[in-house]
């Protein structure tokens, strides 16, 4: 790829990779295939990978040392954020997200980071962030049930699930019902405590998958 973007590295797909070390090696190989690497400076595992490669890099985060940094973060409506982006301490853009969720601040920072080497202008980044209203199965509102919004999200890892639940909670809903479909029993078994913590304040119903029980 011309530009590789690493948002985070978490303990996922370990049934294939076996260890975090081998998972990091896979990301290292991906980064080495890229001419330029854009990475999240707030994620320790990602920083470890980037420190092991010799490629031009652009960092982003809330970390003061990141090249592209989010500051003055505020909610302009429940669950939706706006903030200033600094590049090397200087104003780059003011981002107003069209999608909910604190984690999307990092997605927008990655986008701003990519804009610079691609020759795009700050206004392009601002417009893209404001006009993007999500993609399929990422906090996608499918309809309503008795007046309550029904949201579909492909959060199949505890970290993702926690972000989805936090977004729903920040949007002010008084009652959150989580319908969880485990996409592999092996992952669910290995990370059961983390899954439980992610949905600890919701009503939970689990659906089966086609994988054999473990």
Regions found by a protein language model. Give the residues of each.
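Acidic, Mg2+-coordinating active-site environments of NTP-dependent enzymes
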Residues: 1-150, 173
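Charged helix-capping and loop-helix junction motifs
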Residues: 21-24, 189-197
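Structural beta-sheet core signal
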Residues: 39, 178-180
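Cofactor-binding loop segments of dinucleotide-utilizing enzymes, especially the Rossmann-like FAD-
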Residues: 62, 181-183
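Structural/interface elements that position substrates and couple domains in central-metabolism enzymes
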Residues: 151, 155-161, 198, 210
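Active-site glycine- and acidic-residue-rich loops that bind
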Residues: 155-159, 184-189
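Glycine-rich phosphate/diphosphate-binding loops that line cofactor/substrate pockets in enzymes
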Residues: 167-176, 201
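Residue-level detector of conserved catalytic or cofactor/ligand-binding positions
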Residues: 199, 203-214
């Amino acid at each position: 790829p011309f530009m590789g973007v690493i948002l985070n590295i978490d303990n996922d797909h370990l049934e294939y990779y076996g260890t975090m070390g081998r998972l990091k090696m896979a990301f290292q190989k991906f980064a080495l295939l890229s001419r330029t690497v854009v990475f999240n400076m707030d994620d320790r595992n990602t920083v470890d990978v980037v420190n092991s490669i010799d490629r031009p890099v652009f960092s982003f985060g809330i970390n003061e040392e990141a090249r592209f940094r989010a500051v003055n973060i505020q909610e302009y409506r429940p669950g939706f954020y706006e903030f200033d982006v600094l590049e090397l301490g200087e104003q780059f853009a003011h981002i107003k997200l069209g999608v909910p969720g604190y984690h999307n601040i990092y997605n927008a920072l990655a986008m701003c980071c990519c804009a610079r080497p691609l020759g795009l202008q700050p206004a392009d980044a601002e417009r893209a962030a404001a006009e993007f209203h999500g993609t399929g199965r990422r906090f996608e509102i499918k309809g309503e049930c008795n007046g309550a919004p029904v949201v579909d999200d492909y959060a199949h890892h505890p970290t993702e699930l926690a972000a989805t639940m936090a977004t729903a909670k920040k949007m002010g809903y008084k009652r959150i019902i989580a319908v969880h479909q485990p996409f592999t029993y092996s992952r669910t078994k290995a990370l059961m405590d983390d899954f439980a913590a992610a949905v600890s304040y919701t009503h939970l119903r689990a659906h089966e998958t086609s994988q054999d029980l473990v």
